[in-house]
Amino acid sequence: MPSSSPRKNIRVLFVTPEVFPLCKTGGLGDVSAALPVALRALKMDARLLLPGYPAVLAGLKSRRKVATFDLQPHFPPATLLSSRLQINESVSVPLYVIHCPALYQRTGGIYLDDTGQDWPDNAQRFGLLSKIGALLASDASPLAWVPDIVHCNDWQSGLTPAYLHFHSGKKAASLITLHNLAFQGNFPSDEVAKLGLPDESFSMHGAEFYGNLSFLKAGIYYSDHISTVSPGYAREIQQEPLGFGLQGLLAKRSDDITGIVNGIDTAIWNPATDPYLVKKYTSRNLSAKAANKLALQQTMGLENNQAIPLFGTVSRLTHQKGSDIMLQVAPMLADLPAQLALLGSGDALLEQQLAALAQAFPTKIAVRIGYDEALSHLINAGTDCFLMPSRFEPCGLNQMYSQHYGTPPVVHATGGLMDTVVDLTPETLADKSASGFHFHEMTADSFMEGIKRAINAYHNTRLWKNLQRNGMQKDFSWQASASAYQSIYSLLMQKNRPASTA
């Protein structure tokens, strides 16, 4: 270990299975790029650890070998490469890549093969990620740089806290962020020995989950702290059904769980600079928003009408996103002095049914199947009100985009939607926090009630402008999220002797 000397900067090793733009299957890839950048902007020394998939190795401009690992018989030989993740011309993040051709050098996806099946050796593939994450976060690290915090993400790095727990030497404090509890990394019990975990780890008070080894349960059980992507989701996962069998353990650890809302990229999502808008605007010149409404109506083939509210949604068309409720509500909305613009793709039957509604109400309902980046920006800017009827939503992004664009949303009161959208009430209007509308029952009638509340508010021009400005003035930046994580890191360091003070 390096010799100790005073140091203020917190060192964070961010262990992740994916990071944009090198490799991405979902929102975790975006978070893995954005959060470390925001942490570094707060003067923290955040670095990434990532498996060396072909796309990752191909995307590295330069690399150098900094360590070798002989972890046989549990894992094939591996080397550690040092590089940088280039975010833009002026911003990059230090990156460690695990080069292990036997586990990562193959065609197909990150988690799935070419037929859409899980790779049969995923336990070993992400066991190695977890193991090297733990080694780098302890006094067994071959590197001079040793973190104070190892920040794990979802099941793929869930064994890192377990390996650290059974390491007798100095080690970093561990945090695991739960982005999606539905994916748990459950494997047959014989993987315990294969992965080099002690027998005692495989118990109810450990990584055992209904007879299987659960990477995610291991992370939840052994980590020093747990975070989720919103305070609401942090509460919901401690009970059925969103605990997915882990609600009992999560409830026992409730004092160690913190919900922190993800940020949005305000460089990309900014109505003052957005290149996809026909007219840019800020909270001070909201009248310019009307030009985008007209452009959206023309683009989608809707009647040009500024007098009635135009509702919009950009979504995967799935049961989880409440698209079936949207299907029920759309014709009811068409009977009102209102319009709907929808962009999305997903369930084939829902796609067909929504497209049929657009044909039945051509001046009132417009549907585009697929995804269109430019149109998604124009919908956020050109609609008057955004709709998000998700059954559950750990965090959600579109409701933050829409508020940032002065488009108050109607949302189901769940997870991150409940945390980021403040329901309009006399009290929230008075304290200038109101920014949208909640509905509480997952039914068409309850959703429609929220829409009607929005329509009534829309026709009160002064009230509506207040709602718009309240939403636009909220801080949805990654800096706010990074500051919250900084507070957790500091508390964990007080409880835990840092692995390095050099």
Curated annotation (Swiss-Prot):
Synthesizes alpha-1,4-glucan chains using ADP-glucose. Belongs to the glycosyltransferase 1 family. Bacterial/plant glycogen synthase subfamily. NCBIfam families: glgA, PRK00654.1-2. The keyword Metal-binding does not apply. Its EC number is 2.4.1.21. Pfam families: Glyco_transf_5, Glycos_transf_1. Pathway: Glycan biosynthesis; glycogen biosynthesis. InterPro entries: Glyco_trans_1 (IPR001296), GS/SS (IPR011835), Starch_synth_cat_dom (IPR013534). The keyword Glycosyltransferase applies. It catalyses: [(1->4)-alpha-D-glucosyl](n) + ADP-alpha-D-glucose = [(1->4)-alpha-D-glucosyl](n+1) + ADP + H(+). This is Glycogen synthase. HAMAP family: Glycogen_synth. The lineage of its organism: Bacteria, Pseudomonadati, Pseudomonadota, Betaproteobacteria, Nitrosomonadales. ADP-alpha-D-glucose binds at K24. One of its GO terms (biological process) is glycogen biosynthetic process. CDD domains: GT5_Glycogen_synthase_DULL1-like. SUPFAM superfamilies: UDP-Glycosyltransferase/glycogen phosphorylase. GO terms for molecular function: alpha-1,4-glucan glucosyltransferase (ADP-glucose donor) activity; alpha-1,4-glucan glucosyltransferase (UDP-glucose donor) activity. Keywords: Glycogen biosynthesis, Glycosyltransferase, Transferase.
